[in-house]
């Protein structure tokens, strides 16, 4: 009985017991829930498991006075880092222990899919697979491999010939007595009706399938029009400025402090290896992730962003274009650090649980006759072994913790993804012709963006600043001027928005993916067909969406015990804060305009889910594009004018 008491008083065993208690929620992937839950859609999913965030666990200790044995009443627990707080309660009934030890049997339900023997992994939330980007798969590749010129006329002529042949055949049957007689003689079968085109007795059935055409030629014409328009604008600007491009403000912005920006960016990248050092210390046994490792990492992540914001603004005093580039890149590196650190942090917890469960089984299996206690430890070993072994299936040398290395982190930072895992789908070779194509697309798109900014946007921005600095003549007058500026800048912003999307999510990410042989090119969905802001939030930026889904939405549910609505609010709130910080970096002031419009997406999502809007997809898409066309322009002019 003393051994049993020792085991039951062990904090590690208490933790395992609580993780699998009936009231502790399912021990499973933090993102098993359907992605639609993040945006208020009607879905049903399992409760997420916990990420590594400090959580307090209350353990009620029931001391049984009748025989001196100690039983522990389960409290609540998480999979994260835990701080044990004990409360002794004197009880007089040994049945207390027996009742609560039954909760160990819930382990199987918590770690197995219902009705099957399959484990529920912490990382079941998303998968990576070989797939091209939408533009490559739907437009570029078909255009290169299947374009054969005009096909509609050929198809029409083919069908006309088929129809003429059918009519001749019918005419021949009608004029031939033998053919007509044979029609009614079908070996006793029911008579067959012969359709004719010459009489109204029967109707000729003609295939009415809609004939589709290939619009690849218009794809070429579109880019041709863009190219000629850009060349014309370039020539006009050249002659209007005395045969020189030196006066281009946008060109000056793009070429100022390039060496300084590159140096800061390199320093920022190298400083991300701090999290690798923390993982090495955990690997060597210097630190424990569950007590100090996650704290050091979290503090460093916060200081990382604040420091580089302060450095670029107050010390280096860089131009706003340089500052926003470095700020956005710092966010990318921050998300990569967080995913790498907390992925391995979770596995440290699993590894420690496995070691404890194995040692406890070896020590107590023959001395404790309670099958539920032994079963809990056996199931713990089974699940933890599965979780550790399933992270690296093709390369056994990279199994945790062997994956913790500077090389592993380096390749992760090179891959166009924000979610860390040990293995990714990889292509066999680099297509250098494809890389060249994307490099040309990158510089060509930047060139178009510079022309658009210089001709359509910069003059309006200067007028907006002049309005802001002018004498105040009343709110109505200022609003009228703001509306005029808004109308003038909308066309330029629409072009800039589309070019910016193409530059980052197609040209740059696909180029990086090809250079690193990263197989999954699903960086965006067909967001242009969205009928609600819920769809848009999910598919316009897949890498960030996946990060928010795993490390914010589900983690907030696990760590802070939020429900789905509260976790959705938490996710949108954090996203809105980051967007507002970006506006602060650009405009040097906090106005919370973008924060407000970001949070406004939540009631808009609810509106699109109403019965009136649910089946009106065309109206939904029109409203969506109205927001896309007007939103960025409204934001820019508000920050510039007020």
From Swiss-Prot:
Active site residues per record: 579
Location(s) in or outside the cell: Endoplasmic reticulum membrane
Misc remark: Present with 279 molecules/cell in log phase SD medium.
Segments carrying motif FYXDWWN motif: 523-529
Keywords of this entry: Acyltransferase, Endoplasmic reticulum, Membrane, Phosphoprotein, Transferase, Transmembrane, Transmembrane helix
GO cellular component: endoplasmic reticulum; endoplasmic reticulum membrane
Gene: ARE2
EC category: transferase
Keyword Magnesium attached: no
Positions where Phosphoserine occurs in the chain: 175-176
Lipid bilayer topology: Multi-pass membrane protein
This protein's name: Sterol O-acyltransferase 2
Role of this protein: Sterol O-acyltransferase that catalyzes the formation of stery esters.
Gene Ontology MF term list: ergosterol O-acyltransferase activity
Reactions that this protein is recorded to catalyse: ergosterol + an acyl-CoA = ergosteryl ester + CoA; zymosterol + an acyl-CoA = zymosterol ester + CoA
UniProt GO BP: ergosterol metabolic process
Region (Disordered): 174-194
Chain segments annotated as transmembrane: 215-235, 292-312, 404-424, 442-462, 485-505, 567-587, 622-642
Family that this chain belongs to: Belongs to the membrane-bound acyltransferase family. Sterol o-acyltransferase subfamily.
Enzyme Commission number(s) from the entry: 2.3.1.-
């Amino acid at each position: 009985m003393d051994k049993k008491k020792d085991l039951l008083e062990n904090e590690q065993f208490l933790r395992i017991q609580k993780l699998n208690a009936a009231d502790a929620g399912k021990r499973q992937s933090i993102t098993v829930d359907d992605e639609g839950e993040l945006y208020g859609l009607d879905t049903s999913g399992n409760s997420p498991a916990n990420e590594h965030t400090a959580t307090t666990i209350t353990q009620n200790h029931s001391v049984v006075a009748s025989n001196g044995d100690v039983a522990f009443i389960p409290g609540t627990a998480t999979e994260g880092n835990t701080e044990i707080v004990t409360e002794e309660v004197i009880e007089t009934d040994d049945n207390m222990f027996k009742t609560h030890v039954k909760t160990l049997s819930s382990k199987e339900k918590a770690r197995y899919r219902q009705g099957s023997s399959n484990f529920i992994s912490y990382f079941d939330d998303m998968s990576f697979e070989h797939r091209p980007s939408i533009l490559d798969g739907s437009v570029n590749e078909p255009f290169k491999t299947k374009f054969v010129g005009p096909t509609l006329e050929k198809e029409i002529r083919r069908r006309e010939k088929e129809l003429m042949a059918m009519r001749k055949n019918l005419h021949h049957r009608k004029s031939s007595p033998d053919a007509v007689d044979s029609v009614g003689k079908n070996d006793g079968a029911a008579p067959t009706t012969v359709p004719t085109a010459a009489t109204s007795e029967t109707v000729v059935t003609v295939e009415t399938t809609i004939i589709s055409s290939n619009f690849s030629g218009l794809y070429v014409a579109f880019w041709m029009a863009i190219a000629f328009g850009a060349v014309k604008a370039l020539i006009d600007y050249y002659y209007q400025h005395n045969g020189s491009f030196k006066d281009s403000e946008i060109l000056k912005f793009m070429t100022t402090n390039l060496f300084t920006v590159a140096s800061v960016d390199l320093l920022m990248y190298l400083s991300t290896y701090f999290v690798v050092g923390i993982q090495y210390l955990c690997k060597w046994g210097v630190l424990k992730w569950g007590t100090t490792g996650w704290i050091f990492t979290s503090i460093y992540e916060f200081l990382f962003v604040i420091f580089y914001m302060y450095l670029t603004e107050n010390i280096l005093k860089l131009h706003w274009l340089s500052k926003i580039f470095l700020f956005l890149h710092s966010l990318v590196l921050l998300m990569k650090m967080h995913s790498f650190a907390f992925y391995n942090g979770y596995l440290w917890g699993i590894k420690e649980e496995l070691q404890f469960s194995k040692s406890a089984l070896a020590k107590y299996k023959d001395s404790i006759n309670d099958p539920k206690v032994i079963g809990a430890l056996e199931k713990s070993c089974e699940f933890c072994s599965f979780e550790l072994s399933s992270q690296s299936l093709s390369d056994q040398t990279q199994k945790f913790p062997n994956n913790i290395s500077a090389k592993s982190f380096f390749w992760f930072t090179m891959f166009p993804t924000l979610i860390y895992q040990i293995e990714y789908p990889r292509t066999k070779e680099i297509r250098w012709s494809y890389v060249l194509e994307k490099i040309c697309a990158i510089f060509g798109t930047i060139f178009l963006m510079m022309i658009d900014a210089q001709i359509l946007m910069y003059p309006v921005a200067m007028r907006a600043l002049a309005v802001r600095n002018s004498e105040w003549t009343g709110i109505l007058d200022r609003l009228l001027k703001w509306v005029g500026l808004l109308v003038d800048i909308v066309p330029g912003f629409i072009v800039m928005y589309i070019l910016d999307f193409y530059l980052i999510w197609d040209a740059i990410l696909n180029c990086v993916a090809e250079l690193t042989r990263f197989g999954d090119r699903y960086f965006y969905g067909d967001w242009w067909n969205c009928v609600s802001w819920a769809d848009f939030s999910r598919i316009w930026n897949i890498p960030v969406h996946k990060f928010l889904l795993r490390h914010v939405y589900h983690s907030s549910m696990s760590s802070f015990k939020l429900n789905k609505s509260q976790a959705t609010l938490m996710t949108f709130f954090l996203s809105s804060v980051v967007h507002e910080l970006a506006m602060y970096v650009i405009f040097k002031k906090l106005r919370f305009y973008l924060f407000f419009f970001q949070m406004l997406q939540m009631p808009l999502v609810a509106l699109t889910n109403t019965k009136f809007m649910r089946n009106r997809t065309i109206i939904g898409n029109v409203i969506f594009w109205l927001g896309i066309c007007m939103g960025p322009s409204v934001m820019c002019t508000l920050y510039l004018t007020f």
